[in-house]
From Swiss-Prot:
Role of this protein: Removes N-terminal dipeptides sequentially from polypeptides having unsubstituted N-termini provided that the penultimate residue is proline.
Name the UniProt record assigns to this protein: Xaa-Pro dipeptidyl-peptidase
Domain of life: Bacteria
Organism listed in the record: Streptococcus gordonii
Subcellular compartments: Secreted
Length: 759
């Protein structure tokens, strides 16, 4: 374990004494540090009748148990304090450590011994070995009452709301869109779990088209065959325009009632939301238009879908109506809401957070967009190519639409609406222009970057450098598209498409608690986060604060060599079938230099800290009238590296409240690996100038082009080996073209440029 503490805020002596007193601690500045520590331990061991037994089972140093120490006239020393503090946090002397000073340095222990008041205050804010902060662990065990009222410590709300007394209800928000064309505003189901509280509370909202269930069978049937040739496109200039959605006004009258009439049963939830509920934040789950128990079509990422989610925030602020059921006869107001909202969730859920932020809706104070899409084109396409998300060959937008159109899971809804839905889906297939891979109006209407100037909320991103599903380009573009005055924070980790709120190495959920307590509850604090919090890839459990993602002025340039080299596209039938059957086999052979590729290796002569998108400048020609170029850059050679999927450290040990929704403790393993992908990218040679320009490829005519690979942050040291592989067809991402052509690369006039921080 290694500590990386971002949620803790230094406090004045007056504030520390006051907050400790509110918890029942009577720390006296006139007492000796030893006396104050003894009092502190007696308080936190409240579950024990015989506190002396516990003290006798702990040690003060390698020769003295703690009870004996307190009964002696020995003074409290740095060594004794650290030994005791570590035991309080769940570490075992003689098992986890022998030399306490060396161990504190190894785990980057955040407390510096000196001021016992500050030391004990910070100790309560420090994570235990099993993931909870000490104060959260104590509260979960009943240290203070469940008063169903707010109690703050170090700027964070404590779990003093009973999750068992939470109100669970369902309402149906009247949206301002009519996506199914029936002349009525679409109703959207909202599942609510909120604290039992006499006043008003804020909400964390998860906008998830998956929440009401998915139609996996229909989605699987809509997958595309990737074993097709790359199309030769007609040269043209693509034009798009900014469009607006058509909204619909509320209809009819309804009687006002005070209570919701539909009870919410068990639902799937997000553990960050679970953590926030007993801390006084209502949890809202909204599937949106085209989903089970809601109305409308699944419009998949456009601003009609986002408008319906936005209207839930409008309802929380009194600007839209909600009904108790589908009859629309009884209206229910969100009188319990203080109008302040944060959004949460990963992938499609984080995507909707991005989209919602670009509406500038009043009441949306914070978005926590985890691995979210910023432009849907960049999810299913890249530089004029059809590209599948990593791990999902053959998926395209209509297969996602089929997956999330969960109205068809209700047989009656299927009978009434499936015919119209199929017609809608047929039109969507045409609009995708899968045969060309080109940008068009359909994709432009699902590009949130062009509306980023409207963002008013504070923004938190999380994203993985190894996320080849929602690639790092999405967060990079959104991060840089935000207006300069918007506060933004990026947790850039080394995982894949994963959550980070239950990782041992980073206090992410406590940081979100501090931020939301400040922004949604109005609690006064000095809490702030740096622009970028980056997980160091060169060692286990180490995070660093950075000023920016990209925007580097310095580049390291690597020339590709001399002469010309060829890349053949067509494989033998045997190899083609092997690779088409398992793209992982293709990847393994690609990285080993065994496919049809150009392989270039460099040994670094100095340390290199990459920050931003790598740039490839190529001079090449195709033997035919089309072609694609693929590139991957690897940290190559056996070494210990972070692996992208979190592993389980301890099951169900992180209490999200008070014996409530226990979470697993996870972390990225630091393990021996043969290589690591740093970045990758793909380009249709007919889009070599830009996305809106489709050009002719003249056979055997040299072309000069440059394109950026996926942005990343990655640290390399002197002596490390870089491997660049250039090839055509990628059996995981691109269409699997069988055309017998080759690319010739002019190595002398081609180069790789890596942006880096100054040494």
């Amino acid at each position: 374990m290694r500590y990386n503490q971002y949620s803790y805020t230094k406090a004045s002596e007056e504030v520390m004494l006051d907050e400790l007193a509110r918890l029942g601690f009577t720390i006296q500045t006139t007492n000796s540090p030893k006396e104050n520590l003894h009092h502190f331990l007696q308080k936190i061991l409240f579950r024990y009748q015989d506190v002396n037994y516990v003290l006798s089972s702990w040690v003060a140093d390698q020769k003295t148990d703690l009870l004996t120490f307190f009964q002696s006239d020995k003074q409290l020393t740095e060594e004794v304090f650290y030994t005791v503090a570590l035991q309080v946090l769940g570490f075992a002397p003689f098992v986890d450590f022998d030399d306490v000073t060396a161990f504190c340095k190894e785990i980057h222990f955040p407390i510096t011994y000196g001021n016992i008041l500050e030391n004990l205050y910070q100790l309560l804010n420090t994570r235990t070995k099993l993931g909870n902060t000490l104060i959260d662990q104590l509260v979960s065990e009943g240290f203070i009452p469940e008063s169903n009222d707010y109690h703050f410590f170090n700027g964070k709300s404590l779990a003093t709301f009973s999750s068992h007394e939470a109100i669970r209800e369902v309402v149906y928000v009247e949206s301002r869109v009519d996506t199914d064309g029936d002349g009525k505003p679409d109703l959207v189901k909202v599942s609510i779990i909120r604290p039992s509280y006499e006043g008003q509370v804020p909400a964390v909202m998860t906008a998830s088209p998956y929440h009401q269930g998915t139609n996996d069978k229909a989605s699987d049937k809509a997958l595309h065959n990737m074993n097709v040739d790359l199309s030769c496109k007609n040269p043209r200039t693509i034009t798009v325009q900014e469009s607006s959605i058509q909204t619909i006004e509320p209809q009819g009258q309804a009687s006002l009632v005070e209570k919701a009439e539909e009870k919410l049963g068990h639902i799937g939830s997000y553990t960050l939301n679970d953590y926030l509920l007993p801390r006084g934040f209502a949890n809202l789950y909204v599937s949106g238009v085209g989903t089970k128990d809601s109305e409308g079509m699944m419009t998949s990422g456009d601003y009609q879908q986002i408008e319906a989610y936005k209207n839930v925030i409008d309802w929380l602020n009194g600007r839209c109506r909600a009904f108790t059921d589908h009859t629309r006869q009884r209206e229910i107001k969100a009188t319990w809401s203080n109008g302040k909202v944060a959004t949460t969730g990963i992938s499609y859920l984080g995507t909707m957070s991005n989209g919602l932020a670009t509406t500038g809706v009043d009441g949306l104070e914070v978005i926590i967009a985890e691995a979210g899409i910023s432009s849907w084109y960049n999810y299913y396409r890249e530089n004029g190519l059809v590209t599948s998300p990593g791990g999902y060959p053959g998926e395209d937008f209509e297969s996602l639409t089929e997956l999330t159109y969960s109205r068809n899971l209700l047989a009656g809804e299927y009978l009434r609406h499936n015919q119209a839905y199929q017609a809608y889906l047929d039109q969507q297939r045409k609009d995708l222009e899968r045969e060309t891979g080109d940008y068009n109006q359909f994709w432009h209407d699902r590009n949130y970057l062009i509306h980023a100037d409207k963002v008013k909320a504070e923004v938190v991103f999380t994203h993985g450098s190894q996320d080849w599903n929602v690639k790092p380009l999405h967060v990079y573009n959104m991060f840089h598209a935000l207006p300069a005055h918007i506060k933004k924070h990026l947790f850039f980790h080394n995982g894949a498409h994963v959550y980070i709120n239950n990782w041992q190495s980073i206090d992410f959920r406590e940081s979100m608690n501090a931020l939301l307590s400040k922004k949604l509850l109005g609690h006064s604090s000095d809490f702030d986060l740096p622009p970028v919090i980056w997980q160091d890839n060169s060692q286990a459990q180490n995070w660093m604060s950075l000023d920016d993602f990209g925007n580097q002025e310095d580049y390291s340039h690597f020339h590709l060599g001399k002469g010309s080299q060829e890349i053949r596209n067509r494989y033998s039938d045997e190899d083609y079938n092997r690779f088409a059957k398992s793209y992982q086999v293709f990847k393994n052979e690609l990285f080993e230099g065994k496919t049809q590729q150009i392989t270039l290796d460099w040994t670094l002569e100095q340390d290199l800290f990459i920050n931003g998108p790598a740039k490839l400048k190529l001079r090449l020609k195709s033997s035919t009238n089309k072609g694609l170029i693929s590139a991957q850059l690897l940290d190559y050679g056996p070494a210990k590296r972070l692996t992208p999927i979190p592993s389980l450290l301890e099951p169900r040990v992180m209490d999200n409240g008070r014996y409530y929704m226990l979470d697993n403790l996870m972390e990225l393993p630091f393990a021996d690996t043969p290589h690591r992908v740093i970045t990758k990218g793909f380009l249709n040679l007919q889009n070599r100038t830009d996305l809106l320009t489709v050009e002719e490829v003249v056979p055997n005519q040299w072309m000069e082009l440059s394109f950026e690979l996926q942005p990343t942050i990655y640290k390399l040291k002197k002596g490390d080996q870089l491997r660049l592989v250039l090839y055509t067809t990628d059996f995981e991402h691109t269409v699997r073209d069988k055309t017998d052509y080759h690319l010739s690369v002019d190595m002398e006039h081609s180069s790789l440029s890596l942006p880096h921080k100054k040494s």
